[in-house]
Amino acid sequence: MSGRHNVPKTGPVLLVANHESHFDPPLVGICSPRQLRYLARSTLFKLKPFAWTIRTLGAVPIDREVGTDGLKTVLRLLEEGHPVLMSPEGTRTETGTMQPFKPGISLLAKRAKCTVVPVGVAGCYNAWPRQHKLPTPSPIMLPATPRNIGIHFGEPYSSEVYRTMDRDGILRHLEEKVAEARVGAVKIQRKT
């Protein structure tokens, strides 16, 4: 893990990360210097032990069928001064590579008055690929290999940069920032 100091100690923060597996949000939350909030689809809260764990780590249930609920929830949390983790790909990757961001994040980035921190995640896909019902223990349990997990918090910046950008410009900028942070995560992953 690197770049932890890039997460502001106070005030609203939008952390924008790539989404490799179910491990991403809790691991980013554990690595963060602040207690994060993040959205998780409501169906994940049906398994009681898992629900307790992710709720304890800051998960907020949302119904993915109601598109605007998630945006409203994130804006409310930011207005209350919370740091919120978002995965704008919308779902876990099927291939381990970063997917195009959904357009909703552009509206959120434009409306939010906060600090934005790009977050790169590498190796979580190997630990728990989308196609598997259960995690693969080797990336976490075995000695250091290029298959370990790396998390990098990129340089923070103000959401004000998005005020004059159109949707496509915002999406491009966010994707570039998260891709840069992911490069940092891969470097950390290879060092561990």
Tell where the protein language model's regions lie, with residue ranges.
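N-terminal signal-anchor transmembrane helix
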Residues: 1-11, 191
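Short, hinge-like loop/turn segments at secondary-structure boundaries
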Residues: 55-58, 80, 134-137
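Hydrophobic/aromatic ligand-binding patch that stacks against planar heteroaromatic rings
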Residues: 28, 53, 76, 107-111
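Residue-level preference for the first positions of well-ordered beta-strands
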Residues: 12-14, 81-87, 117
